Amino acid sequence: MSDTNVFSDVEILALTGVGESESLGEKGMQQTINTVMNRAAADVDWMGGSDVRTVCLQPGQYDCWNPGNDRDRIISIGTSKPDYQPYVTALGLAESAVAGSLPDITNGAVS
């Protein structure tokens, strides 16, 4: 079983926001989450297709999921630090994105 199987699609999306853009604050995490949603909407194989989870975990796309980068840290946040404020913020953004109510502040960007 993959170490990411314990997470829902929303959690994977939120952790991607944290892993890629935590240092940029809420706006940066929203931009990352927007790009994931835009890639899923584009449904391009090399970007992971139309599934949010697959887009996030597609090898070579979001560096935080690549082995040797931030992967262990973000998995740890998801499994043992549910109250970590950037993660809480990203979860709210991810829930809104999946519900279709998060504004796209990237103007359709995929990167």
Model regions and ranges:
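Bacterial extracytoplasmic/cell-wall-associated proteins, especially those involved in peptidoglycan
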Residues: 2-111
